[in-house]
């Protein structure tokens, strides 16, 4: 123990600390400065950035023994407060720099460190600074953050008035389609929004901290579990195993596909008989501190009989592979696609055919905030779970039988959360904390470290694909054949739905009258597959978009013109036989053409013998919704103070549920003249909010947006006075009229895809885009640099352009990572952000251009579609096509690491 007298945010603090204690822990736990966020705990993400004696440091790797007496420290709390924002914070709000917001305090503190030393930086200075200080963002694509720093610098330098950093309301008062800032933005940029780990510091005395005992092998029988030594460790309350679980000890995948050969009850909460993947949780140590719990977890002894581990789809699908789940074949689901005529004769007689084998790998989500959850038994006897769930009502039914409670005895609440990008479509820590709270009767808190985030949360499922096109010599597509094998890891939840995506999106964007294909889902012992932005489209469209370029080359056609020739037009149908609701792709290609020609000319002019430049194109398509007649519910309530509360369970993991709720409600309530700041929204809670469905598949703006629209329209009708005007709250109460009105909406025009043919109308609203990538390839090293990305986007009528821009920038950045660096194949090497190929700012170009070519959707609320999936449908395919354009070599298996490109160049 040592004494430190330091000044934090201008206030002298007399502290007694362990010399080895981390500055981040002291600031958060002893001083309550939870604006200092902790992400990676390895100095790789910058979320914990503070200014220490004039220098930006990462507090999570700075030990107190290195902090001098008298040190001056500035955290986000010292930069600005909600009522007194610093220009950087104002600029962050204005430019949409805070999406999930978890990284925002660290970025803003880092940016202040820059402006304190360089008051007039260039954009490249800003980018170099954030790269040097390892400030990582997974949401924004970095461009809005640089925009914010530049504008803040201009204000600080007196080049702009500070009023330029404030949103200007449109003259008509309408915020639909504007850049109205997110309602949560100020809390995010000031560090005052409490995320799961922050809330954990506010739990009552007696709260137990949990640590997982995890498998260090990928497949094994469990012969015994010895907890005796762990129980003697300091601070340990108990060690929970499968014997303490009161329910079925399984998370159900809620299987709805009749041809699935499994029953969905294959994922243990705490492993009992077998380990199915590396990192599986075998026991939970409950202790008085996280450190004590983790130390004791190392003392639990597990006797294992190791089994063959199948770490890829082909290995698990081999005839001699043992069943991972005894009684269920490893290949447990098949989805055919049968459209039009038999393709065999068509391929035999076609002018041109082309074929390719493709692979998209196990992309990790890599949020900056690791998984976190807590649970407690409420005074009403119910078990309450607070987590990063993006499907609170969905998860309620997935975990209730496993923990041993009826759904009405379990409550799920979505915390303010960092980005998830889909991994939280699957439950992760929810069942674990519920089991612990029920077993101990005490509040419990569980926080994953970053290694656990990487190793024990789901990943994008890898696909092995073979796709063939048959075409006329003029480029008209005649037929397609496809085969795709989906490695979904050991747990089946949603694996069948993901496999169906291949039938829906391989070849999407083009009129292909005749299709035959088969998708198969296989259980393996690698990490389980979960939803990831784009959900099946990045795999599907990588194959078909690369193949389109291969066909263009064989025909001697320009790749853009081949796409133009075959893009959807009236009378055409998509792969499942559905006619698109709008036909914007030809228009988008027409508008892209001059940009494309200019990019080609620039690439040709600037290419050298050592650095080759190229341009690539791809089309992206995705549906907004869950398959079939998806539905949502919302409530609109007039409050006594004249405000309106929109009640939904629209989970916000950075995509903008706050502005989605407020923007949609404001548009619907315009006749009433309600100001946007008078519209409130709710945090998802299964006990107090309606079932709005999960935040995945770009469904919420369409499904819950429509439900909000209906609820608000119904509220308007309820409030209308016969002679004009609207009743007040008091008038409604006096007349015994309701002040809270329900709105329901169902995608009634959608149908499920057929189990035998794959045909159907799965979505009533789709999103469409055309991507262009510009790259430079260093032929000596194989290193690919993306110089610029352009997306022509049709997203209907935009609810909020600021949120939409941010979603697109972030999706493009993730596409660059998917194409070039991101993977989770090596369980140990890829267990950190850097190891897994996280794209920092210098890997993402500052040139990210968006052109909206929007066509209002008949079934979208006020014409809107979804947003989030589109920007990650196929940007990686455009990048790979650009590498081919630059060098003449094609990469078929992602990611296109430099050594892989170099090997192809030398072949």
Swiss-Prot record:
Keywords: 2Fe-2S, FAD, Flavoprotein, Iron, Iron-sulfur, Metal-binding, Molybdenum, NAD, Oxidoreductase. SUPFAM superfamilies: 2Fe-2S ferredoxin-like, CO dehydrogenase ISP C-domain like, CO dehydrogenase molybdoprotein N-domain-like, Molybdenum cofactor-binding domain. [2Fe-2S] cluster 1 binds at residues 40, 45, 48, 60. Binds 1 Mo-molybdopterin cytosine dinucleotide (Mo-MCD) cofactor per subunit. InterPro entries: 2Fe-2S-bd, 2Fe-2S-bd_dom_sf, 2Fe-2S_ferredoxin-like_sf, 2Fe-2S_ferredoxin-type, 2Fe2S_fd_BS, Ald_Oxase/Xan_DH_a/b, Ald_Oxase/Xan_DH_a/b_sf, Ald_Oxase/xanthine_DH-like. Mo-molybdopterin cytosine dinucleotide binds at residues 653, 869. The keyword Membrane does not apply. Its cofactor is Mo-molybdopterin cytosine dinucleotide; [2Fe-2S] cluster. Residues 2-79 form the 2Fe-2S ferredoxin-type domain. It is an enzyme of class 1 (oxidoreductase). Pfam families: Ald_Xan_dh_C (PF01315), Fer2 (PF00111), Fer2_2 (PF01799), MoCoBD_1 (PF02738), MoCoBD_2 (PF20256). Disulfide bonds: none annotated. GO terms for molecular function: 2 iron, 2 sulfur cluster binding; aldehyde dehydrogenase (FAD-independent) activity; iron ion binding. Transmembrane segments: none annotated. Its EC number is 1.2.99.7. PANTHER family: XANTHINE DEHYDROGENASE (PTHR11908), XANTHINE DEHYDROGENASE SUBUNIT D-RELATED (PTHR11908:SF157). Belongs to the xanthine dehydrogenase family. Homodimer. This is Aldehyde oxidoreductase. The gene is mop.
